[in-house]
Amino acid sequence: MENTDHTNNEHRLTQLLSIAEECETLDRLKQLVDSGRIFTAYNGFEPSGRIHIAQALITVMNTNNIIECGGQMIIYIADWFAKMNLKMNGDINKIRELGRYFIEVFKACGINLDGTRFIWASEFIASNPSYIERMLDIAEFSTISRVKRCCQIMGRNESDCLKASQIFYPCMQAADVFELVPEGIDICQLGIDQRKVNMLAIEYANDRGLKIPISLSHHMLMSLSGPKKKMSKSDPQGAIFMDDTEQEVSEKISRAYCTDETFDNPIFEYIKYLLLRWFGTLNLCGKIYTDIESIQEDFSSMNKRELKTDVANYINTIIDLVREHFKKPELSELLSNVKSYQQPSK
C-alpha cells in the first residue's frame, strides 16, 4: 500500500530528523522516505516505576511525528525485560500494572491511537517461536564482551555483576527489530542511550544479509540537578513525574540548576525538547517566542525566577491532562497502586 500523505519527501525527511539527535544512517532514511511506502517504527520501554515527563512527552510527540510522516508505530511494552532486569523485584504482576499505567499516560497526552500498536513482550514472545530462534542466532553472532558493552541499555554498567538473564537482554532487544513485524522494523526510535544495541542489530543484519534498520535516536534530558546527570527515576528531585502535584512541579523547577548559559542547562533543555515542541509558541518572561534560536539569544538576560515560574506553569498545563485522565473511576485504583510501588535499588 502506497503512502497517501501529501507532504513532500523533503519535508517528511526534515520532520523525521527533527526528532533525532543521531541518525544511522541518513542515506537509508532518505531511501525509505523516497520509497513512499508506509513504514514501521518502534519504541519500547520497561514498566519499571513512575513515568517521568521526558519519557511521556517525547514518546507521544515522536510517535505522532512518525505517523504524520506516513509511518506506523509499535510501542513495545517490555514486561519480561523488566522482570529479567529485576525491576519491581521481579514481580511480573506489578510490572504489568505499571505497563497499563504507562499506556494510560500516553493516551492522556494525546498519542495517535489510529497509527499506534501496543505489543506486550510476554505475549508476543510466547506466541512467536521464531523469536527465540532469532535471539539465539544473535547470541551466536555476538561475544560476551560485545553484549556486556550494551549493558547501558538496562541502566547497568559493564563492570556490574550481572545475572545470566541480563546477559540475554541485549540479544532479545536486538531480536525485537527483526521479529516484531514479518518484514522487519524500518526505524528504531529509541533514546541515544540505546544506540549500542541498535548498532548490534545493524551489524547483525549486515552479517546475515537482512534488511538493515535505521536508528533514529532521541536526546536524553539531563537531571534538574544539573550537568553530568541524566534524568532518572532513582532521583525523584531530578525529574518531573507525570503524577507530580502542581506544588511538587513548582518546587522542583524552582530548585533546578539554571545559569545564564544554555549549555548543560536543564531548564533550557525542558524548553527546547519539551515545551516549545509541545506548545509551538511560548510566553517567557513576558515575551512571545516561536523558535529556539530566539530563546537561546535572550536566555542570559532572562530573569531566572520568572522564567522558572513560566516553565512550571507550562509543565503543569500538560500534566493537568494526565491528572484529569486519572480522575476516571476505572483508573483511580490503577494510579493508587502505581504510587504505592517502591522500586528497590539494584
Curated annotation (Swiss-Prot):
The UniProt record lists the EC number as: 6.1.1.1
Q: Where is this motif: 'KMSKS' region?
A: 230-234
Superkingdom assignment: Viruses
Keywords recorded for this protein, A-Z: Aminoacyl-tRNA synthetase, ATP-binding, Ligase, Nucleotide-binding, Protein biosynthesis
InterPro entries, per database record: aa-tRNA-synth_Ic, Rossmann-like_a/b/a_fold, Tyr-tRNA-ligase_arc/euk-type, Tyr-tRNA_synthase
> Where is the short sequence motif 'HIGH' region located?
47-56
Positions contributing to ATP binding: K233
Q: Name one Pfam family in it.
A: tRNA-synt_1b
User: What is the enzyme's class at the highest EC level?
Assistant: ligase
Q: So what does this thing catalyse?
A: tRNA(Tyr) + L-tyrosine + ATP = L-tyrosyl-tRNA(Tyr) + AMP + diphosphate + H(+)
MF terms per GO, please?
ATP binding; identical protein binding; L-tyrosine binding; protein homodimerization activity; tyrosine-tRNA ligase activity
Q: Which GO terms describe its biological process?
A: tyrosyl-tRNA aminoacylation
What this chain does, per the record? Catalyzes the attachment of tyrosine to tRNA(Tyr) in a two-step reaction: tyrosine is first activated by ATP to form Tyr-AMP and then transferred to the acceptor end of tRNA(Tyr).
Subunit composition and interactions: Homodimer.
> What family does the Swiss-Prot or TrEMBL record give for this protein?
Belongs to the class-I aminoacyl-tRNA synthetase family.
Q: What is this protein's name?
A: Tyrosine--tRNA ligase
The coding gene here is YARS
